[in-house]
Regions:
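Sequence/structural signature of beta-propeller domains
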Residues: 2-195
Length: 195
């Protein structure tokens, strides 16, 4: 969930995702399989009223359009939609993207993806020792505008979850002993992002 930036009127636009169901490789009646992004415009005078609109969905373009939108970052002019494509749908035709939805034009396009280097043996020995070849084995996590924090315009951070990057050194990272996950991850800085 995130809201549009830029003005009080814009701030009443709230965007959120319905990631989609991942329990099956086939659609389930009454549910979105590939995922959706909605816009809720809150009424300026009545907080109990508003208008809900579907702005992006993947069910009409299975495997080529959006796949399991999970996180969202909204600026004044764009909605950045981060995919969590590790549902491993057999019809998926691309790895996880960050999509850029233009609020004014109402268009959605792939904006960023990760290079898995699946044919590079040395790379895979380090970052994909299990030789996972299905699309979506890496996902994008949260994306946040940090321009105002660091004083550099159009600068964002993005979390990356490469599920194939596993090492014993990553085990028990929080020290609790409760989690057996040993996946690595990164937070990266991206500059010159359109706002």
């Amino acid at each position: 969930v995130d809201y549009r930036k830029g003005s009080a009127s814009n701030n009443r636009e709230v965007y959120f995702t319905a990631t989609g169901q991942s329990s099956s490789n086939a659609p389930v009646e009454g549910y979105t399989m590939w995922g959706r992004v909605y816009k809720l415009v809150l009424d300026a005078t009545n907080p109990l009223a508003g208008k809900l609109e579907l702005v992006v969905e993947g069910d009409s373009t299975p495997g080529t359009g959006i796949i399991n939108p999970d996180n969202i970052c909204v600026t004044e002019n764009y909605v950045y939609i981060q995919e969590d494509g590790d549902s491993y749908y057999s019809a998926a035709k691309h790895d996880s993207y960050i999509w850029q939805y233009s609020i004014a034009a109402k268009t959605n396009k792939p904006w960023l993806n990760m290079n898995h280097k699946r044919t590079d043996a040395a790379w895979n020995a380090l970052y994909n020792p299990g030789n996972e070849t299905r699309f979506g084995s890496w996902e994008f996590g949260a994306m946040e505008d940090i321009s105002d924090v660091i004083g550099v315009p159009n600068t964002f951070i993005v979390n990356i979850h490469p599920h194939t990057w596993q090492k014993d050194a990553f085990l028990n990272a929080d020290g609790s002993g409760l989690n057996t996950n040993k996946e690595g991850g990164q937070t990266i800085v991206i500059r010159n992002v359109q706002r």
